[in-house]
Amino acid sequence: MDLTCFDLQQSMEFALKYLIEMNGERYVTTHDLNAQLNKIDKMNIHDPVLEKVRLKSYVYNSWETESRYKDSFMPLAADVEEAISVCKELILFVESNTNQKAELNKLTAF
């Protein structure tokens, strides 16, 4: 379960950073999901899934270190199941948002 939680946090973090970079900005150099979400807010990108990540970011952020270094780490199964769903939804949103940008870039390249 430890590795699952770590991988979920990392997947969300990398998806947010990818979204930022693919929209022409530099991501914040931290593992904090809220820092990336704040940057995305400033970029005027909004979606309900981003709010889902924000609502549980205190849980997901803790997984980045606690899952690897805290022997007593024991996540709630409901949190893990919800995180899997949110992570999938986030990745789909990021793919959709960045694919639209890529298509727009192709159209304006000429």
Task: State where each predicted segment sits.
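Terminal alpha-helical segments
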Residues: 1-110
